[in-house]
């Protein structure tokens, strides 16, 4: 059966913020028969499949087979991606224009965000019963509400020579035109659901707060805080005269999330033995040093809770970890035909030739000789095409969560990922044949013997 890339594109289209990545993935797992657990409850576990929402932006799913002591396997990915985030108190004005004050999340290629219709997605936190009991609501505009316009070439003759953008000045999106007191101050954005929602006293709230209140269908006074990401509203697509490529936002790292999801669902379908886990971390793009990131204690704590609930001792758990294996999945740099000199001279991943095994003696990518050999064997058993990726010696590459998380949970780990062009652009490019190869590996690793 031919692999359906439309399912990948549908998934990416739904995952417009880390919160939505977790929500979409969680629903897929629940639909597949996983049972949701809470971090706040005591766990009573038996053979079966379970999932835990960790602080809204990280997700942990696991399957326990008939013989939990058989093997521990973990696959990881990350839910976040380079983007524009809205600051608190974001409204600023200039000569009749209303703009959003924003900051850059991660290492995005800034000029690729210019002139793109932008939607907004994330979470809005509302007043609850008391200070500790608040309500969180997911928001996705699903339509463009803002744009960062370029400066015309007639006003910037050197633009094609390369222009450095000032993030605080030139990356602020336009939201609307200012209204005076006689105009409806929220007409362009609000009143979509309830034209009479606001009273004259609502002038104490800025246009962004009013807009969010309309999206949530609440009074502006109920909004306490938010985490909102701006995202390109243009959908991903298959392209090329022979359909060889996929162009889409957020391929880094939703391709990995999609592959790991496939694997943990396969573990349930096959009732795989041992303990098979999938962890989707947040904050990889900003260093992982958070409570929900790969550099935190969340994964070791979750693994301990699983084995504690199954009645194993700490010494037995340490033994399972030392014998276990983890695959960390994050994208790699494919050969760019216009910049071939940017890749290594002998380890050159090409689009549509399979996933990349990422190797670095600096350990910016996790792995050792045995881990590399193991994952090669897994790829061969799964009939998953693979390549080797190593950075050029004179161009330092990025890092990812594999080495970070394995330092917190000492087990053999390898970094893999699909090769991309234009990584961290507002739209990235991948080979249309490659997602199937990653899914094959993850299905075999988590769902196999």
Model-assigned labels for residue ranges:
Residues 1-449:
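N-terminal hydrophobic/helix-forming segments and targeting peptides
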């Amino acid at each position: 059966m031919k692999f359906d890339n439309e399912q990948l594109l549908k998934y990416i289209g739904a995952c417009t913020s880390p919160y939505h990545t977790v929500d979409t993935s969680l629903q897929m797992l629940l639909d597949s028969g996983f049972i949701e657990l809470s971090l706040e409850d005591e766990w009573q576990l038996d053979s079966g499949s379970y999932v835990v929402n960790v602080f809204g932006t990280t997700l942990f799913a696991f399957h326990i087979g008939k013989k939990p002591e058989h093997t521990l396997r973990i696959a990881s990915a990350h839910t976040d991606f380079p983007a524009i985030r809205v600051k608190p108190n974001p409204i600023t004005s200039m000569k009749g224009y209303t703009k959003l004050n924003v900051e850059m999340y991660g290492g995005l290629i800034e000029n690729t965000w210019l002139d793109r219709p932008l939607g907004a997605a994330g979470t809005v936190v509302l007043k609850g019963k008391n200070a500790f009991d608040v309500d969180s609501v997911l928001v996705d505009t699903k339509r463009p509400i803002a744009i960062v316009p370029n400066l015309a070439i007639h006003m910037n003759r050197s633009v094609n020579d390369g222009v450095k953008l000032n993030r605080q000045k030139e990356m602020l999106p336009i939201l609307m035109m200012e209204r005076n007191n006689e105009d409806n101050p929220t007409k362009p954005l609000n009143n979509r659901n309830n034209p009479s929602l606001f009273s004259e006293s609502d002038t104490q709230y800025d246009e962004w707060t009013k807009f969010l209140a309309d999206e949530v269908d609440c009074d502006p006074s109920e909004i306490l805080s938010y985490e909102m990401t701006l995202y390109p509203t243009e959908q991903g697509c298959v392209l090329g005269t022979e359909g060889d490529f996929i162009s889409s936002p957020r391929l880094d790292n939703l391709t990995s999330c999609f592959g790991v999801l496939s694997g943990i669902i396969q573990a349930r379908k096959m009732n795989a033995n041992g303990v098979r886990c999938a962890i989707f971390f947040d904050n990889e793009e900003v260093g992982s040093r958070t409570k929900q990131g790969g550099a935190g204690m969340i994964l070791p704590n979750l693994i301990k809770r699983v084995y504690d609930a199954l009645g194993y001792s700490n010494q037995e758990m340490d033994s399972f970890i030392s014998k276990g294996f983890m695959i960390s999945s994050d994208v790699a740099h494919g050969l760019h035909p216009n910049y071939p000199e940017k890749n290594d001279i002998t380890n050159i991943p090409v689009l549509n030739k399979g996933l990349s095994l990422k190797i670095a003696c600096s350990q910016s990518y996790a792995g050792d000789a045995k881990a590399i050999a193991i994952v090669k064997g897994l790829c061969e058993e799964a009939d998953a095409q693979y390549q080797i990726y190593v950075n050029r010696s004179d161009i330092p590459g990025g890092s990812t969560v594999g080495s970070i998380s394995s330092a917190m949970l000492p087990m053999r780990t390898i970094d893999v990922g699909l090769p991309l062009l234009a990584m961290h652009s507002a739209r990235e490019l991948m080979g249309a044949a490659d997602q199937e190869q990653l899914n094959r590996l993850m299905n075999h690793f988590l769902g196999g013997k």
